[in-house]
């Protein structure tokens, strides 16, 4: 796989608390230069990114209920609606892990449904935080997302004890089938890991190390 091909898998990400306006502008410049799929940013920076990215082909992705997922569903839905109004083209919401652990699957479904309705056709990715779930819980959460026809299921916020694993990505892909995307995120920092995730079924990669990932491919392929 060539660097330009793998770049289209990458959501170039900057979600940590200390990110400044200059950090976001740099992120946008890098995304344009390297042809990344999107930038993934907190919603407060959407207007800034929109000014920078309009007409470039790089999309703006934002997060909702991040990173805990424990907000009221109505708050998540409003957050998604406002983010889209500001210019977000993709939304990554965090599932309510506490409800999963409580066995309240109808409420888990309702939480996702409310955000999905608020998105009104804007691509929705549902973050499962797989490091906190059993395999059975991952499967059940994926089945709900598949039945609701969300855009993607996503492994991780990157803010918990661990991120994506090849085994979890493969399980998610097996469960949702071929019509829903799988996004691997959290701890993906090099080319080898990225390719392993793609081979396991990931169709999107969330990473703050996108440049290092494609530079590894350049090194291996002898050029861009």
Curated annotation (Swiss-Prot):
Molecular function in Gene Ontology: deoxyribose-phosphate aldolase activity
Any one biological process term the GO annotation gives: deoxyribonucleotide catabolic process
Major localization class: cytoplasm
Superkingdom of the organism of origin: Bacteria
EC number: 4.1.2.4
Xref: InterPro entries: Aldolase_TIM, DeoC, DeoC/FbaB/LacD_aldolase, DeoC_typeI
Active-site residues (renumbered): 92 (proton donor/acceptor), 154 (schiff-base intermediate with acetaldehyde), 183 (proton donor/acceptor)
Keywords associated with the record: Cytoplasm, Lyase, Schiff base
Catalytic activity: 2-deoxy-D-ribose 5-phosphate = D-glyceraldehyde 3-phosphate + acetaldehyde
Broadest EC class assigned to this enzyme: lyase
Pathway: Carbohydrate degradation; 2-deoxy-D-ribose 1-phosphate degradation; D-glyceraldehyde 3-phosphate and acetaldehyde from 2-deoxy-alpha-D-ribose 1-phosphate: step 2/2
GO annotations of cellular component type: cytoplasm
Compartments it resides in: Cytoplasm
Family membership: Belongs to the DeoC/FbaB aldolase family. DeoC type 1 subfamily.
Record function comment: Catalyzes a reversible aldol reaction between acetaldehyde and D-glyceraldehyde 3-phosphate to generate 2-deoxy-D-ribose 5-phosphate.
Name of the protein this chain belongs to: Deoxyribose-phosphate aldolase
The species this protein was found in: Actinobacillus succinogenes (strain ATCC 55618 / DSM 22257 / CCUG 43843 / 130Z)
Gene responsible for this protein: deoC
């Amino acid at each position: 796989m060539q660097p330009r091909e793998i770049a289209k898998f990458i959501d170039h990400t900057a979600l940590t608390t200390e990110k400044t306006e200059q950090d976001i502008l740099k992120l946008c410049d890098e995304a344009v230069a390297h042809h990344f799929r999107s930038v993934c940013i907190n919603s407060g920076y959407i207007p800034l990114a929109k000014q920078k990215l309009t007409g470039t082909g790089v999309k703006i992705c934002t997060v909702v209920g991040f990173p805990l997922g424990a907000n009221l569903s109505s708050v998540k839905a409003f957050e998604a609606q406002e983010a889209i109004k500001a210019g977000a083209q993709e939304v990554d919401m965090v599932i309510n892990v506490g409800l999963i652990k409580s066995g309240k699957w109808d409420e888990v479904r309702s939480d996702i449904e409310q955000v999905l309705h608020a998105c009104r056709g804007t691509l929705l990715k549902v973050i499962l935080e797989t490091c906190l779930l059993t395999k059975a819980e991952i499967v059940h959460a994926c089945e709900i997302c598949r039945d609701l026809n969300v855009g993607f299921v996503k492994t991780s916020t990157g803010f918990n004890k661990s991120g994506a694993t090849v085994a979890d990505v493969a399980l998610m892909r097996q469960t949702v089938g071929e019509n829903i995307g799988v996004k691997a995120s959290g701890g993906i920092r090099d080319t080898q890991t990225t390719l392993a995730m793609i081979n396991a079924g990931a169709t999107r990669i969330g990473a703050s190390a996108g440049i290092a990932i494609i530079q590894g491919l350049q090194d291996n392929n002898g050029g861009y």
